Amino acid sequence: MGTAALLILLAGVSWAQREVAIQPGPLYRAEGSQISIWCNVRGYQGPSEQNFLWSIYLPTAPEKEIQIVGTNDPSFSYAIYSQRVRSGGIYVERVSGDRALLHIRQLQDQDTGEYECHTPNTDPSYHGSYSAKVNLQVIPDTLTVSSPAQTIQKVEGGSLQVTCEVSQNSSRHTHLSVSWLRLSEGEATEIISVTQNFSVRPGPSYAQKHSVGDVRLDKVGDSTFRLTLYNLHPSDQGDIYCEGTEWIQDPDGTWFPLTQKRSEGTSVTVLPTDKEFNVRLETERRTYNGGDTATLRCIIEAQNPGDRLFAVSWAFNSSLIASQSPGGVPSLTGEYARREDGGELRVGKDSDSVFSLKIFRLRPEDSGKYNCRVTERERGPSGELIDRESKRPKNIPISVLPLRTSLTVTVTANSSSVLEGVRLSLSCSVASLAGPQSRVSASWHLQDKQGRQRDVVRQDRDGVTWAGEQYRERLGTGGLRLLRSGSDTFSLELEGSQRTDAGSYECRVAEWVPAPDGEWQLLGERSAQANVDILALETGFAVTAITRTPGVTYFDSFDLQCILKPHYPPWVGVSVTWRFQPAGGGDTHDLVTFSRSGGVQWGERAGSFRGRSIVEKGDSTHTVRLSVSRASDSEAGKYQCVAELWRRETSGMWARLAERASNLLEIRVQRPVPRLQVTKVTRTLSVVEGSPVTLSCSIRSQSGPDSRFAVLWLVQQPSGAEGKLIGRSDAGTEFGTYPEGALLKGRLQLGVTAPGQYALTLQGARTDDSGSYYCQVEEWAMDPNQAWYRLAEETSGLTEIRVRPPDANLQLDQLPRNVSALEGQSVTVTCHVLNRTLPDSRLSLEWLCWRAGHMERRGLARLTVDGVLGSVEEEPGDVAPGLPSRVQVSQPSLGLYALTLRGTEVRDSGTYSCLVQEWLRDPRGQWYRRTEERSGATYVSVRQPDPQLQLDPSLLNVSVMEGGHFDLDCMVSSRSRPDSQLAISWSLQGTSRGAEPETLLNVDRSGVWAPLAPRWEGRLQQLQLSPTLFRLHVPRVGPGDSGNYTCLVQEWLLGPRGDWYLLAQDEAVIGWIRVQRKESNLQSTICANDALFYLVFFYPFPIFGILIITILLVRFRHRPTGKPGEGKNGVPLLWIKEPHLNYSPTCLEPPVLSIHPGTID
C-alpha cells in the first residue's frame, strides 16, 4: 500500500505546471519618470526562493535579447545597462520568494521595448511557462505648469485670486489633475484639487471654507485654473503654488501618474484690519494760464478702501464747490453747477481711493485755495449711514494768469526767384495757439519794388475770404487762391506770375478767444515777411551744343544735344533748329527744326539724314537731341543748333523774344579698325598613304559681324619654295580650283565647317602630295552706303604634310578562353578583331582546330576577302567525322566573327583559334596582303552529362506468413536527365549461409523482360507507378523467399549520333523479408489485430494510473499528523522511479511492466 501511495504522489506531482505572470501591458511612461513592473511565478517545484532574470527586446532588433538585471548573477547585465545597474538606476526588489519588482529610475527614450521576465527552471522536468513579456513605451514629457511669481499683500477679510497654466501635448490619452497648495514654515497644506476623474476635492484644512463658498477652483479656457479665496485670514498667508500631474490608465484599470510638476509660488501676506485713514491732495502744477485745464486729486490712504464708505466734499476759498457720496455721485452748488452744465467743470471718482476735480478753461477769478474733506461713514443697525471720522489735507493755492497770445508766424516761398509766368506760392505757418477754443484770422499784403502797399487777400476767423481791390479779378478767375491746411497753415498761390508781383509779402495772423459774455476777444496779432523776385523770360537765355562721341566709326551712332537754359515750363514757346556743314566743304544748311508747338520739319537738303536720324525734346531736361545712326562719310562735318524764345501775348499772338546760337560741333567718321586675326600655328602632319588629309584655316577674330571673307589655299613644294594657288573660296562663298592645282582637282574639297572655320580636304593622299600648305584670308566689309571694300588681309601658319605608307596595326583578341558544354549542345568560338591598319582594309579568316594526339592543326572553315565562305574537305580517318558539316560561320557585329559547332561530341574537344590576314589597296586600286595575326586559343571541352542517378535507400523490414504476398518499391530519387531511360533488375540474397544472389527479374530500358527462373515463372509482377517508382509484387510466398531483396537501376542516354549508351547505375537493398510458417496462438492473434493490441497492451496503464492517484488523494486527506513527506514507519514516499514498459519491436513478445526502486537523496 505504501508503494501505491508513493506512485500516486509521483503522478500528482508530475501533473503540476509552472506559470510565470507579469504586469499586463502595454505600459506607457513619461521620459524622466520611474516605473516598477511586477513579476511572479507559481506552480513550481524546488526552493521557495525563485530567481528572476529581466531582459529587453528593442524595436530596432525585436529578435535580439539584451540582458538587463538578474537576482542570481551580478554579471548578468549587458554593457549597455551595467552602469545603470551598478549605480542603482535599475534594480530588482524581491517582494517574496516567488514575486519580484523591476525598478527603473529616470526612464530614457531608448528604454522603449518588450521586457521579458524569466525564471530559471528548478523543476525535475520542463513543464509550463518560464517567462512572460510586457511592452513598455517611453513617451516625451510634455506637461507644463506655470504661474507668475509675485508678492501680494491683502487685508484681513479681503479676497485673493491667482491663476495657473497647466497643459500637456501627449500623443496618448491622458488626464490631468491640478492641486493648489500653501507652503508655510516648510509645511505644505492642500487647499483644493481637481482629480484626474474631474472631481473637485478640498484639502482637509479648507473643507469648511469650501462648504461656505470661501474657496473656489475654476477652469478658465483650455488650460487656466483659477483659485479664489474669500474672507482672508492671517492663517491663509504663505507661498501659494499649483501642482499639475499627468495620469494614464494602465490595462489593469489603475491610474498611474506619468509626471508631476509645480509652479512658482505667490507670496501672500494677510495684514490685520486697520480702521485708520489719511487724506492727500495733489495737482500737476500751481500756476496756469487762462483757458488751461486744472486737475486736483483727493487721495485716500487706507486699508481695503473698496470695502469702506468714504464721502468727499470740495471747497474753494472755504466755499463749497461740490460733494460726492460714497458711491461717487456728485452734487454741485450755485455757479459751479452752471459751469458743469457748460462743460467747464467735472467732479468724478477715479478709483476706490482717488476722487478728482477738473476745471476747464480757467479764468483769472479761479485763482485761490482749494481743498477736499473726506468723511468715513458706517452703516448703523438699521442700515442708515453714520459719519465716523472726517479728515482734510492742507490747502493748495492755484494762480490763473490773464489771457495773452503766444502765436508764432513763419512765411516761406517756393522760390525766392520765380520765372515770369510760373506759379508763385507762399506758405504762412502758425504755431502755439492759446487753446482749442481759440480761432485765428489771416491776411496777405504786398509791398512792391516801388514801395507801394497792396492788400492781396484775407480770411476771417469764420473762414470767409475776400481779395484786395487790385486782385479781385484774379480771385474770380482762379488766378489767386488762399488755402488753409488744418488750423495752422495759410497758403497764397498766384498763377501766371507777372513782373508786378515782385516785392515783399507779409502774412498777418490774429488770435481770437471766446469771452465770458459770448463775444470774441482779440488776444494778439503776429506777422512775418518773405521777399520774392520775378525774373523776365529772356533773362539768362542761352544755348549750348554738346556730344560725347566726336569721333565715330562706320555704322556707329552719335548723339548731339542742344541744351537750353534756363529750364522753361511747357507753356513757354521755344523752337530749335539743327544746322549742318559737310566735312568736304560747302554751305551750312538747316537739317531739322523742332517747332515751339512740338512739330518736326526737315530741311530741303536733309538728304540721307531723314532715314537715319531722330529728333527728340525732353520736357524735364530742356534739351533737344539729334540722334544719327549708321554713320558714314556723308554724316561727317560740323553741327550747330539755333534756339528762338517766344511769348504768347494777351491777344493770343506769339512774339519772338530772343534768338541764341550754340557753339559748333565737329563729327569725324572713320572706317573700322581691322581686327582680323588668323591662327598662325605651324605644325607637321604625318599621314598614311590613301587616307584623307584635312587642313583648317581658323579666323580667330574679325572686324565686324557682317564681314565676308575670301580664302586662298596655297602650297609650297618643296617647303620654302614660292606658294602656288590650288583653291579659293571668294566672298560670295563660291569654291573653285586653279591651274596650279589641276592635278589635285579630283581629290580636292573646299568647305566651311563653322563660321570662321574653313577647311581644305585632300582625298587619297599620295606621297607626291607632301609639302607645306597655308591659307591667305581677305576680309571684305560693307560701308553704310551698301558698297563693299577690302578691309584687311592675313596669312595663316604653315602645315607640313608628309605622306607615308600605312603601318601594320592588325590586332586580335589574344585572351585565352575556356568553353565547356554537354554532349549534343552547340558551342560558339569567337574571333574578335580589335584593330586594323586602315578602316577600309579587308580581312580573310581561317578557323583552325588542334586535338590531343594530333600533331598538326586542321582547318575547319575559310572566309575570303570578298566575304565568301569556303568549306574544308573531310580528311580520311578523321577523329570527328562530319565535323565540317556541323560548322557555321557568322559575323554578329563589325570586327567580331563567330564559329558555331552544332551537335557537339566528346571528340570535338580541342583548341580552336582563327588566322586573320589583312589586305590593303594601293592608290592605283590593287589589293595586297599587309599582315596576318593569329587569335588567342579557345579551349573547348565537350563532356557527357554528370551521373546523378540515386536510389532511395529506405529499407522495408516485414514478416509475411507463408502463402501470403508482399510488395517491394524501388524509388529513383534523382536521375541525370529527364529524357534518359531506365533498366531495372531485381535480385534476392537468401538466408542460407554461403548462398549466391539470385536474379529475380531483368527489365531493359524498353520495358522488355528477360526470361525468368522456373521457380519464379508466373509469380512475379512489376508495376511502374511513375517514371521513377517501380514496384515488384510477389504472391504465394514460401519459406525460401526469405532474405534481402536488391534493386539495380541502369540509366541510358541517347548520344548525338542516335546511339544509346549506359551513363550510370545504382544498386540498393530495398527490403528484408521473413516468411513464417502458419501457426495459430494468442500472441499471433493479438499482434495481427491493431485494435486488440492497443486494448491489451496500452489502455490498461492510464486507467491504472488514475486509480492510484485517486487512492493517494484519499490517503492524504485522512493521514495522521506526522512529519511531512513520510509514510508509515517514517519511510519517505517520493523514491519510486517511473514504471518502465518494455515492448517487443516485432510484437512477438508481450510487453513487460517493471517497477524499479530508486535511491533516497
From Swiss-Prot:
Residues 17-1091 are extracellular. Disulfide bonds join C39-C117, C164-C242, C298-C372, C428-C507, C562-C641, C697-C775, C831-C914, C970-C1047. Residues 18-135, 140-258, 272-382, 402-523, 541-651, 674-796, 806-930, 947-1063 form the Ig-like C2-type domain. One of its GO terms (cellular component) is membrane. Keywords: Disulfide bond, Immunoglobulin domain, Membrane, Repeat, Signal, Transmembrane, Transmembrane helix. Residues 1113-1161 are cytoplasmic. SMART domains: IG, IGc2, IGv. Its main location: membrane. The chain crosses the membrane at residues 1092-1112. It is a single-pass type I membrane protein. It is found in: Membrane. It comes from the Eukaryota. This is Immunoglobulin superfamily member 3. It comes from Xenopus tropicalis.
